[in-house]
Amino acid sequence: MKRIRFFDIAKGMAILAVILGHSAIEANLFMPHRTAQIIVSICFSFHMPLFFILSGYFMHPERKFRWAKESKQLLCTYAVTALCVLIGVTCMATLNHESRVLALRQWGMAALYGSGDVSDLTLWPVDFRIGAIWFLLALFWARLLLHFFAKLPYTFIWVIACFLVGYGSSRYVWLPWSIQAGMCAVAFLYLGYLAKKYDVLDFVRRVPYIWINAFLIWIIDIVFFDGMSMAMNSYGPHPILAVVGSIAGTLCVIGISQLFDKVAVLGDTFSRIGQASLAILCAHLIEDDVLLQSWQSYLDMLRTLFPQVPLVLLSFIVRLPIDFAGAALLHYVPKINEWFYPQLAKQHQLNRAGIVHKRAFPLEK
């Protein structure tokens, strides 16, 4: 399927929202501020739902589940990123004259458990969370489950049941590998799949007032936001509003992306960021975990140097080049780069197909 640029733009906006949201959380922990809380509400109201919905949009669950491809793109990517975290925290422990063994044990357990945040409901004690790459594990489970449900009658019922079981069980126990997060994410993937199947975007284009309704719902969701986190199946005290609001927010961001697509500079910039969103997510996770114990002291230093600049903005500005540099580095690592940049794997396949075609038909012009 030909790449749709405004979807890349939407993913670019979403990955920036991930980094900005985490920057706001750190800034708010350091010095609680209403601006940071508003930014958290906006970012977390849509960024992860958008990634799952867009993933579902390009799925073909009626086909066979491609174990090799999904494992490389999601599980191997998770493993490489987690390994980089372990190397990074070991280096930081050495620099800070702390126990390398303790750092490896704590972060190794976090990587093994694969939880997006710390929980008291884990099967065994886990001191740290692996963080944002919970998304990779959850997406793997969600894709696998949707492929299974798509071959059953009443797929919609199975998807709802899966969401309810994942959501309900997570109130009592938090299983490893973000299994329950994946069970809930199935619903968002399925919505994306249905949006493609029934050409919802074309319908919205023909009925413009839907944009207004979606925007109003999204604003209401942001105003009443109280801690939605797909990582831990936490949808706040108003779970229905959180889910509906995240869908409305995703639709609004796609609408904004279509507008950006008409402006050359904005379209080019955000689409490039979107195409690198998986690599940026993993680079951001490495930075976030490795520097976890140091961010508070860094924020104190930044506040002293630039007292007039909002702390959230300072944190975001510092993180962004680190994450972009890490993503760029991943682009140049042979073989592994195809896991973090799926378009490279696709291009490689096309090149190989072209070579085979030329060998089969050497005289063809």
Language-model features, listed with the residues they occupy:
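Alpha-helical transmembrane segments and their immediate juxtamembrane cytosolic regions
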Residues: 1-365
